[in-house]
């Protein structure tokens, strides 16, 4: 049993009767010492900027990964998750015309709408290469497109918005001196007349492998395939006016089999790190085998007047490509599908003896070995346009499933017609293209089947636009370029 002294009992009785306010006052020194650091820490935490849910984090391979969005490969930089909006302006200076693409990205490089569309897209003809003798006029031809781009970008963001001009096969075909004169005129225009941020190296002739790689990234980005195994990606064939590109992902084993290339030529395989996945991308650009350039190759390849089997009856004239002019008149007996196809095969050099590899496409070029990355093909640009004009694809559809044999069947129908009947049957074909419609369709079928080895009855996807976030985006290489420049800005 505990004993309490009288003094202790008195003290306890005194403490029990003490008011709370008196206690706080008596222990105020202790409270200040304890609570001051707590309050200071809380204040610091309150004032610190909060990272959004989509902030970037470090990926397993040292890649900066957007935690809630898409990501770009090794060139991705910090700060993309800050919720800021950024724009990129990309000019596609092709052989058949000039096009401007304006993209708007959020902090994770996901596309944001521009007005009612997911991008601004405008185009005009002719292309820069049509002004080979007047570089200043070539540059001026871009002014109206530049003005369209400026209209949709807020004034306060224009100075920090990068503008790139990528010239493709048409300008490459002019040679170094003439193409550089045009490019310099464009650089001067952007420096003097544009409110966008430009750098001299951003106005350039794209090499074919860059163009093909950007196109592959664009389509697989929009389809949501990046980050998946290479076998889940799609291959891309892009038929421009001056060149055609083939790009598809291959296995690391096949990448190791890539043959060496001559000095100055692009390597067959590019290694890309995208969404934490390494891809070995086979890509090759075939200069002079775009649709408009191939006409010249076919006209040259004909022995004697063989080429006339590709021209519609009733056409008398010449074909100009670059600085070259070719006779291009039809026979009184009309075109012949089978004879035209023989000329197209010869123009492609399918049996080129220079093939020193196990598998080649045409012209002695290694084909990448094939494989899963090529099984699902997306085929773009002039393939879609001619299919729509020939009537076996809805011209208003963003994409369509077809077979190479559809081009063959359309070619057989067209080659039987004369110019007048073809104009009446295919009203969507421009007057200057009608005489070449038989040739174009024969070439496209021959390119797919004999050139790239696609089965005539394999399903392929003709693509003009790709569905993305309840909208449709142009299936063109500029988006891949825009992602790169936006992520490295």
From Swiss-Prot:
GO terms for cellular component: membrane. Residues 50-489 are extracellular. Its cofactor is Ca(2+). Keywords: ATP-binding, Calcium, Hydrolase, Membrane, Nucleotide-binding, Signal-anchor, Transmembrane, Transmembrane helix. The chain crosses the membrane at residues 29-49. The keyword Disulfide bond does not apply. It comes from the Eukaryota. The keyword Transmembrane helix applies. It is found in: Membrane. Its main location: membrane. It catalyses: a ribonucleoside 5'-triphosphate + 2 H2O = a ribonucleoside 5'-phosphate + 2 phosphate + 2 H(+). GO terms for biological process: nucleoside diphosphate catabolic process. It is a single-pass type II membrane protein. GO terms for molecular function: apyrase activity; ATP binding; nucleoside diphosphate phosphatase activity. Its EC number is 3.6.1.5. ATP binds at residues 89-99, 235-245. The active site is at residue 211. It holds the Pfam family GDA1_CD39. Residues 1-28 are cytoplasmic. It is an enzyme of class 3 (hydrolase). Catalyzes the hydrolysis of phosphoanhydride bonds of nucleoside tri- and di-phosphates. Belongs to the GDA1/CD39 NTPase family. This is Probable apyrase 1. It comes from Oryza sativa subsp. japonica. The gene is APY1.
């Amino acid at each position: 049993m505990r004993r309490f002294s009288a003094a202790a009992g008195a003290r306890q009785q005194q403490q029990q009767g003490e008011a709370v306010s008196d206690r706080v006052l008596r222990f105020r020194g202790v409270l200040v010492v304890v609570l001051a650091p707590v309050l200071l820490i809380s204040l610091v935490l309150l004032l610190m900027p909060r990272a959004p849910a989509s902030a970037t984090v470090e990926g397993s391979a040292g890649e900066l990964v957007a935690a809630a969005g898409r990501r770009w490969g090794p060139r991705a930089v910090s700060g993309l998750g800050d919720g800021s909006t950024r724009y990129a302006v990309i000019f596609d200076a092709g052989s058949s015309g000039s096009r401007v693409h304006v993209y708007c990205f959020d902090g994770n490089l996901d596309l944001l709408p521009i007005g009612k569309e997911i991008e601004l897209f405008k185009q005009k003809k002719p292309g820069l290469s049509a002004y080979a003798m007047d570089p200043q006029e070539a540059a001026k031809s871009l002014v109206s497109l530049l003005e369209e781009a400026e209209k949709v970008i807020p004034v306060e963001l224009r100075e920090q918005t990068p503008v790139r001009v990528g010239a493709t096969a048409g300008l490459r075909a002019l040679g170094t001196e003439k193409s550089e004169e045009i490019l310099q005129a464009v650089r001067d225009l952007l420096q003097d007349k544009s409110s966008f941020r430009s750098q001299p190296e951003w106005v350039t002739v794209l090499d074919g492998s860059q163009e093909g790689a950007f196109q592959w990234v664009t389509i697989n980005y929009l389809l949501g395939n990046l980050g998946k195994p290479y076998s889940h990606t799609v291959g891309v064939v892009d038929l421009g006016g001056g060149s055609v590109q083939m790009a598809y992902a291959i296995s690391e084993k096949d990448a190791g089999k890539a043959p060496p290339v001559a000095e100055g030529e692009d390597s067959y395989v590019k290694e890309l790190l995208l969404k934490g996945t390494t891809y070995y991308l086979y890509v090759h650009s075939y200069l002079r085998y775009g649709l408009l350039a191939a006409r010249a190759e076919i006209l040259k390849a004909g022995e004697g007047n063989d080429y006339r089997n590709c021209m519609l009856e009733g056409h008398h004239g010449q074909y100009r490509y670059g600085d070259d002019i070719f006779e291009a008149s039809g026979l009184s007996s009309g075109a012949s599908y089978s004879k035209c196809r023989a000329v197209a095969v010869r123009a492609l050099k399918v049996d080129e003896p220079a093939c020193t590899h196990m598998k080649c496409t045409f012209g002695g070029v290694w084909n990448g070995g094939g494989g899963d990355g090529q099984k699902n093909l997306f085929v773009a640009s002039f393939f879609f346009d001619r299919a729509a004009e020939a009537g076996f694809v809805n011209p208003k559809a963003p994409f369509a499933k077809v077979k190479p044999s559809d081009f063959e069947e359309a070619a057989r129908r067209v080659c039987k017609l004369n110019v007048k009947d073809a104009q009446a049957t295919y009203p969507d074909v421009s007057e200057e293209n009608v005489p070449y419609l038989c040739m174009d369709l024969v070439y496209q079928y021959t390119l797919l089947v004999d050139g790239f080895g696609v089965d005539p009855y394999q399903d392929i996807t003709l693509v003009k636009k790709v569905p993305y976030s309840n909208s449709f985006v142009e299936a063109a290489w500029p988006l891949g370029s825009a992602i790169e420049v936006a992520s490295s800005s």
